Amino acid sequence: MLKNSLSGIAVMFACCAISMQPATSAQGPEVVRKVLMQHDLPMPGWSEALVSVEIPVGGREGRHTHPGPLLVYVTEGAITLDYEGQPSKTYKTGDTFYVEADKIHEGINMGNVPARALASFVTPKGQPLTTQAK
């Protein structure tokens, strides 16, 4: 049961890790994010969030980080992940990926249909889900 609870929490935090601010016009079409659920975890000092994300064709999130781990499940389309220190990788419908805390990354939709995902964020309480990279 604890394992399931921790998995659920990790999923929630990953969602929060996704930037909650829309992409700027310089980054292409606007990325849409919606917090579906957010609450404190039973672990002192931590909270979690589950976020739906839609990246339109040609859209990009902008380079950013999260203060905690992020788990992402791609529900439609494909997301190309540019991840600090690694080659870009494309994740398609049904794929999952993990982003470490404080690692600069960016999700990009290079496909011909909108990309949608569920992201779970686990973050220190009171911290923003996402911080744009400098």
Question: Across the structure, where does each feature detected by a protein language model lie?
Answer:
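Short acidic-glycine-tyrosine-enriched beta hairpin
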Residues: 55-56, 85-102
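Ligand-binding loop in jelly-roll beta-barrel domains
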Residues: 88, 102-128
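C-terminal segment of classical bacterial N-terminal signal peptides
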Residues: 15-23
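Glycine- and acidic-residue-biased ligand/ion/polar-headgroup-sensing regions
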Residues: 66-85, 95
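Histidine-centered metal-chelating micro-motifs
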Residues: 60-62, 80, 97, 101-108
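Extracytoplasmic
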Residues: 46-50, 66-69, 86, 102, ...
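A short glycine-rich, His/Asp/Glu-containing loop-to-beta-strand
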Residues: 28-63
